[in-house]
């Protein structure tokens, strides 16, 4: 009765593959909406404001990853404990864990907001951001960083809902927010001529709506109706949450910092190369959207079944996820080889000679990533399974491997094969991390014998 009323899902019984697919589909649809928004945003900025504005947005991609990765990592870590309590039907500790997660998220979001605004200019200068775009990049960041509290709140509320098997509410929030974002993008950028500032303002408004929507839905779930007592200090609760959350934060930061080093190298190739790299990175989310969705489904599935003590179901679920991931990655790769150049051309405008050069750079990078996409999908399966098991340390170690491989490839390969070497940095990072995660998962599962 409670599950029907609150629209949450018990994943400790039923077909593992079916449960994972049904959970992942709304997340995929939400990611599609988000990526369509990102593509429209890129098209509007690139077509209306020009190649320099497009490059200005691309120059801050990895810096935004680092900053938003803090709240995303924390809430992902917190949701692991929430899913385990839900799987064990320990609703009292579920409520306490949620209340303490709220408090920690608010405190850390405030700190990140202050630090990010304080050091944004310094970081862009240190990255040698091209002089003709650094002003636009900084303006965009200043506005986006004002939305950090809204982003953190949305991540927290959406993670809590997913931990209890509800992936439909975040989908609804994402659909409405994406429509709102695109509408405001067109109004602010094309209509009012606000350029990158208009794109940033539209994003902050839409993200704020998503947070409010998910919070209102979460409040209607009876088993997590919080009282003042739930916010009272509970022995070891904050420590357990941070033990799960901090490694995920460091994992995200390490990956993001590696990306910043790559961005530093790319900035030295000029703004046309930056624009081409940016165009492909805007499609990157489309490439990995299903992997992210499967990842969230696996974390919830594994966490709930671990809480219920059903280890065999965990193995079956991960095997099903591997097959799903392989098939999905092959389909997406084929689509990128066939239609990737046409999609990329939508993002680029300007002088014919410049646009052809940017398009050639972008499609070469896209082709390399598409060929090895299956590695990224396996990475998500193993990392998410370990996180669901409560192991956030080895995913952090794999993040360090990504960091080392990405930087090494970015700094070394261009000396041997020219600028194209930078495109293989991402592949090297995926491969190193996947090997570590694969070994760690099977070693950990062997212990359950």
Where are these regions (language model features)?
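N-terminal transmembrane alpha-helices
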Residues: 11-48, 62-77, 81, 106-113, ...
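Transmembrane helical elements of multi-pass membrane transporters/channels
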Residues: 22-41, 143, 154, 177, ...
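Small-residue-rich hydrophobic transmembrane alpha-helices
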Residues: 54-114, 151-170, 276-340, 376-398
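Short runs within selected transmembrane alpha-helices of multi-pass transporters and secretion channels
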Residues: 75, 143-162, 170-178, 199-212, ...
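Helix-terminus/linker motif at the lipid-water interface of multi-pass membrane proteins
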Residues: 32, 36-55, 124-131, 187-194, ...
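Short alpha-helical transmembrane segments in multi-pass integral membrane proteins
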Residues: 1-24, 82-147, 191-246, 302-371, ...
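Hydrophobic transmembrane alpha-helices of multi-pass small-molecule transporters
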Residues: 66, 181-185, 211-215, 286-289, ...
């Amino acid at each position: 009765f409670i599950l029907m009323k609150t629209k949450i899902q018990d994943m400790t019984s039923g077909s593992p593959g079916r449960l994972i697919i049904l959970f992942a589909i709304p997340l995929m649809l939400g990611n599609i909406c988000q990526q369509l928004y990102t593509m429209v945003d890129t098209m509007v900025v690139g077509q209306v404001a020009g190649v320099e504005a497009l490059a200005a947005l691309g120059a801050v991609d990895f810096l935004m990853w680092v900053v938003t990765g803090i709240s995303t990592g924390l809430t992902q870590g917190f949701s692991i404990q929430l899913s385990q309590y839900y799987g064990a039907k320990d609703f009292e500790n579920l409520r306490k864990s949620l209340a303490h997660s709220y408090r920690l998220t608010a405190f850390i979001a405030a700190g990140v907001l202050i630090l990010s605004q304080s050091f944004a200019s310094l970081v862009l200068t240190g990255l040698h951001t091209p002089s003709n775009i650094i002003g636009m990049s900084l303006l965009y960041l200043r506005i986006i960083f004002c939305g950090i509290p809204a982003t953190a709140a949305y991540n927290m509320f959406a993670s809590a809902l997913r931990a209890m098997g509800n992936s439909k509410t975040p989908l609804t929030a994402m659909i409405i927010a994406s429509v709102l974002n695109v509408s405001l993008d067109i109004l602010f950028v094309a209509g009012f001529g606000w350029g990158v500032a208009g794109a940033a303002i539209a994003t902050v408004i839409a993200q704020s709506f998503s947070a409010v929507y998910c919070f209102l839905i979460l409040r209607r779930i009876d088993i997590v109706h919080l009282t003042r007592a739930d916010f009272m200090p509970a022995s070891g609760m904050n420590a357990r949450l941070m033990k799960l959350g901090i490694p995920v934060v460091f994992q995200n930061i390490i990956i993001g910092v590696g990306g910043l080093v790559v961005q530093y190298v790319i900035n030295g190739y000029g703004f046309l190369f930056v624009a081409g790299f940016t165009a492909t990175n805007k499609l990157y989310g489309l490439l990995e959207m299903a992997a992210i969705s499967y990842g969230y489904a696996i974390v919830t599935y594994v966490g709930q079944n671990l809480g219920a003590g059903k280890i065999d179901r965990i193995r079956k679920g991960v095997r099903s996820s591997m097959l799903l991931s392989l098939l999905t990655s092959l389909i997406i790769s084929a689509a990128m080889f066939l239609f990737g150049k046409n999609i990329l051309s939508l993002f680029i405008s300007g002088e014919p000679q410049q646009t052809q050069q940017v398009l050639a750079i972008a499609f070469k990078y896209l082709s390399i990533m598409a060929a090895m996409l299956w590695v990224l999908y396996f990475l998500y399966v193993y990392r998410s399974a370990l996180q669901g098991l409560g192991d956030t340390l080895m995913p952090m170690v794999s993040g360090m491997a990504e960091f080392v491989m990405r930087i090494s490839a970015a700094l070394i390969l261009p000396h041997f094969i020219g600028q194209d070497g930078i495109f293989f940095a991402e592949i090297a990072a995926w491969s190193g991390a996947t090997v570590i995660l694969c070994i760690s998962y099977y070693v950990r599962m062997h212990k359950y014998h």
